[in-house]
A protein has these predicted regions:
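Boundary of Sec targeting at the N-terminus
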Residues: 2-4
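Intrinsically disordered, low-complexity regulatory regions in eukaryotic proteins
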Residues: 10, 15-19, 38-43
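N-terminal edge beta-strand
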Residues: 16-27, 31-33
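Short beta-strand elements of extracellular/lumenal beta-sandwich folds
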Residues: 32-51
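Helix-rich interaction surfaces within compact, conserved domain-sized segments
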Residues: 43, 48, 125-163
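Solvent-exposed beta-hairpin/edge-strand motifs
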Residues: 52-87
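Extended, solvent-exposed segments with strong compositional bias
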Residues: 82-116
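Low-complexity, intrinsically disordered segments enriched in Ser/Thr together with acidic residues
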Residues: 111-130
């Protein structure tokens, strides 16, 4: 996982060692509280081994920000590096809904998404007030499987203090 600050985070190092925990790459355009930000929650092709017919993103209950379905996009993306920024391009046709009082994003593509490219959920959101760490989780269902969702990994997002 990587934040827009690019700094090393000791908690990320600790979480990486937890059995069953898998950090996923993300990028935020702004990390200060109460600022408008774009969240790029990426699932790289190396992070999944099967096509996706449904993707669920769980949001912690203490993440006090308003997320609207119209501000959510599912797309093919490219992770940034030192010389390029993270960006999402071609939109993947999908039905996107919010459930569980806005704490579950359900994405159902019109056809299963193959494993050959990095995909991402792009959110336009106003960051919650105050600093904190928020663990968003990715769960996916694949074609032909029992309807149980498989854990793909987590984005541990840190918002810095100050205003």
């Amino acid at each position: 996982a990587q934040s827009s600050t690019g700094g090393f985070d000791i908690l990320n190092l600790r979480w990486k060692n937890r059995e069953g925990f898998k950090p996923l790459y993300y990028f935020l355009t702004r990390t200060r509280p109460n600022q408008r930000s774009t969240y790029f929650l990426l699932i790289k092709k190396k992070d999944r081994d099967r096509a996706i017919m449904k993707l669920d993103v769980t949001i912690p209950s203490y993440f006090k920000a308003q997320i609207e379905p119209k501000n959510i996009r599912f797309a093919y993306c490219e992770a940034g590096s030192v010389s390029s920024r993270t960006k999402c391009g071609e939109t993947i046709p999908a039905s996107i809904s919010l459930n569980n009082d806005g704490k579950l994003i359900e994405i159902v593509p019109t056809s299963p998404v193959p494993t050959d490219r990095t995909i991402g959920v792009e959110l336009q959101v106003r960051n919650p007030y105050g600093r904190g760490m928020y663990q968003f989780n990715a769960l996916a269902q694949s074609p032909g499987e029992v309807t149980l969702a498989k854990y793909l990994g987590s984005w541990v997002i840190e918002l810095k203090g100050g205003g």
